[in-house]
Amino acid sequence: MSKNSELYFFIGLRIKQARTNTFGHRLMTQTELAKALNVSFQQIQKYEKATNKISIEKLDKIAQYTKKPLAYFLPHTVVDSTTISG
């Protein structure tokens, strides 16, 4: 599995986890989340299975809707100490 595939697999898993609690009880359905994002429930399925890549904008909307920080959906990464200035 490529790094890119692993990333989207991780994101998909986190989307599903955000919809359900650790005991598997439903917090929201794919349909409910889809309506909030103005996409089909099939699109949510594809995000969760990493069949389709999700944009950062959609991921941010999922984070807002599920009340999770955006970082929750991304694997832990370490950024070097180099300062980037604009």
Can you say where each PLM-predicted feature lies in the sequence?
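A detector for short, charged/polar N-terminal pre-domain segments
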Residues: M1-I11
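Helix-turn-helix DNA-binding elements, focusing on the entry/boundary residues of the two helices
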Residues: Q30, F41, I56-L59
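Recognition helix of helix-turn-helix/homeodomain-like DNA-binding domains
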Residues: L37-I54
